[in-house]
UniProtKB/Swiss-Prot annotation:
One of the protein's GO biological processes: response to endoplasmic reticulum stress
Organism listed in the record: Dictyostelium discoideum
Cysteines paired by S-S bonds: C57-C60
Motif Prevents secretion from ER per UniProt: ranges: 406-409
GO CC annotation, single: endoplasmic reticulum lumen
Protein's name according to its UniProt entry: Putative protein disulfide-isomerase DDB_G0275025
Biased composition (Basic and acidic residues): 260-273
Amino acid sequence: MKLINICIFIFAIICIESTFGFYTDNSNVINLTKKNFQQQVLNSQQNWMVEFYAPWCGHCKSLKPEYEKVSNNLKGLVKIGAINCDEEKELCGQYQIQGFPTLKFFSTNPKTGKKGQPEDYQGARSASEIAKFSLAKLPSNHIQKVSQDNINKFLTGTSDAKALLFTDKPKTTDLYKALSVDFFKTLTLGEARNLNKETLEKFNIDKFPTLLVFTNDDGETFTKFDGKLTHSTIYKFLEPFSKKSNNDNNNNNNNNNNEESTKTTTTEKDPASEKFIEIKDEKSFEKSCSTGLCIVALFDQSSIDDKELNEKYLELLNTVSQNFIGRMKFVWVDVSVHDKIVPQFDLSGTPNIFVINNSKKRYTPFMGSFSDESLNSFFKSVLSGLKKAIPFTDSPKFNSQQKKQKDEL
């Protein structure tokens, strides 16, 4: 009787593992089936490491923690998937799986952008070795090498947007290689080294790495990335500039499992890179908006009624701004105190918004309504270069001290 109970218990455990699989929905290992394999793996740009396993297999159970570790460390760089062969016999048979676990690497052809025949992984079953093998398969030939001799050709050769990474590292990083796979044939990525001092100063390059996106072929109009150096943040910054984004209304094909989980350092940021901050003088404006694109919101705070309404507008702007972190800065100004800005930029009252590139002396006024859809559309159009920018001469003028309050009874 005792033996029967033990057998029943073991059978129950096997059934549970077979039903729910090794890898839960919270895992970074993506469960693959016949229904999603074609779309997820074969039709995608990303490289995939795929484990073919059986839930009762002892070696599979031993591999599981290492495979989970790989999926965490390579998140955003290489896709990590798994197929339960007890449930997906046809799919496993298609790849002639005869033992468990079997690891196969599905790489994208760097010339065609399509998947070829998978490669069997024959290395050690450790997280470090699997990761090393997977990262070595990332292509570097998607990235154009930019030097002092060809930088002008790179920037002006086409009117399409192009991203340029200014770096002092001798080799291309795995992160930038992975991004080049994500944007294969939809956004040109370049990497610049050993440029002269004059060129670096022209583009305000004061540290490495610095990532700029040039939105047309004038070689001068660019947007600077100021966010965290993670795959998900950089992807979110680059995606609106890609051809795919412009063609399908910003349809992000990389929403799932695109955040990098490993700890990274962050670039030093001004508070205005995260949310709207109030600007009260030219010095603070220069600190936040000296380079790149800056969204300037104008409010009249002279009455209590205005303040209450403006708070609602500001709350909306802070919500919308989360979609543009790393691509724009966010500031607001009380024009009841600094009353020169509205006429200086030929704006029609308040509340109002314009996007300014102070280093290039160009601005783009907002003409729509204060709504989530209208604001998002406007900011995306500015980033994509679809909105015409207006030249100006002088930076926004701030009063040296607050205007005196009117006498009140």
